[in-house]
Amino acid sequence: MTLLSGANSVGYPSQMPAKRISWRRLVALLPNSIGLSLKPVTPHLRDLHLVQRRLQDDFLGCEALWTIFMAAAWSYRYRTRLRPFPSHWNTIDLVFNTLGDAPRLEVLQQQLMHCDYQACSPNVVRLLTDILVDQADRVSLSSLRPCEFQELYAHLGMSPPKQPPTQIFEVRTGKGNEKGEAYASLRQENKESVRLGFYGCKLEKVYALLNSQNSLDNGKYLELTCDINEALARSKPQAGVGGSRCGSILRCVAVVEFVFQDNETSRDKKQVIIKDANTMQVSYLLLYGQSCNEYAMERQIKLMAEPARELLNWLERYHKKAISLGVGLLIVSSMAHFGSTFFRLLARTGFYVFKRGIL
């Protein structure tokens, strides 16, 4: 109710008692030119509050989880990387369009702090809820402070890596995670066989590694190493999310706990092959983030120090492909006239690649 004072016009006493009029009646009496800011009811308001709470609890953990999801979704191998596929989405095209409309999490947090609940479309809210709330109830990431890194190394019984990570996240499994419950039961029965290993990989592989129960189907396996520096060398850099606190160029090393059950090992016992996903669990994630300028400078320094190292690394790592390439170049060169200087050079190159592949 609104209180209106008495009028002083002719015929109306100035000491008339105040008259009450309802708010609805007052709005009806106002001219149409005076607009009132009546905000519509925001859909998915409860979901936005849940997302806001997760961002407030651990912003870095949410951003890492969102970055890992985006890396898997944008991969051309999304069919194997994005597992399980978000339940409310039918096609990858719809996921792409929604990711294109989604704001940066830092911007979203500022909008929610100022009670701006109209900035995100319903699809964006639904996807944020799926990844940061529903999916995080099963597997979530908890960020560690830099001062806790040394304590973690001592707890795991490992030497600090030569290149310190920019962020470390503890992987936590929630209730209803069947994979986590199965591993916890196996771990309890085989406490003396529990081991730790390191797995360096591209960021797009981490989503399925954390969430999928069938990540090692169809003959797939993980090759773990006991040296974290070697694992980091195997991790290929991948573009992250622009403006992310995790970094623009990211490399990832997973600290994997597993139950040793007569697994295959290398001759020097430094690598272990894991073929059953139920016998392992990712305990921590180490992220190495760089800006684009830092990555370009590092790459330029490596190329200046060893100009041909990239080609030699490729030949050593993919010797089978090198043999195929060398044979192909030899065949192509043999089809031309022997007097051609170009094809002579091509033949010599093919023979060199072929020789390196065999060696």
Curated annotation (Swiss-Prot):
Catalytic activity: L-aspartyl-[protein] + NAD(+) = 4-O-(ADP-D-ribosyl)-L-aspartyl-[protein] + nicotinamide; L-lysyl-[protein] + NAD(+) = N(6)-(ADP-D-ribosyl)-L-lysyl-[protein] + nicotinamide + H(+); L-glutamyl-[protein] + NAD(+) = 5-O-(ADP-D-ribosyl)-L-glutamyl-[protein] + nicotinamide
Keywords, comma-separated and alphabetical: Endoplasmic reticulum, Glycosyltransferase, Membrane, NAD, Nucleotidyltransferase, Stress response, Transferase, Transmembrane, Transmembrane helix
Chief place where the protein resides: endoplasmic reticulum
Membrane topology: Single-pass type IV membrane protein
Documented EC number(s): 2.4.2.-
Keyword Transferase: yes
Listed GO MF terms: kinase binding; NAD+ poly-ADP-ribosyltransferase activity; NAD+-protein mono-ADP-ribosyltransferase activity; NAD+-protein-aspartate ADP-ribosyltransferase activity; NAD+-protein-glutamate ADP-ribosyltransferase activity; NAD+-protein-lysine ADP-ribosyltransferase activity; nucleotidyltransferase activity; protein serine/threonine kinase activator activity
Its biological purpose: Intracellular mono-ADP-ribosyltransferase that may play a role in different processes through the mono-ADP-ribosylation of proteins involved in those processes. Required for amino acid starvation-induced mono-ADP-ribosylation and subsequent formation of Sec bodies - which are stress assemblies that promote cell survival by preserving components of the ER exit sites (ERES) during amino-acid starvation. Catalyzes the mono-ADP-ribosylation of Sec16 which is essential for Sec body formation.
Organism field: Drosophila melanogaster
Cytoplasmic side: 1-324
Binding site for NAD(+): 199, 221
Transmembrane segments: 325-347
Record family assignment: Belongs to the ARTD/PARP family.
GO cellular component, one term: nuclear envelope
Protein name: Protein mono-ADP-ribosyltransferase Parp16
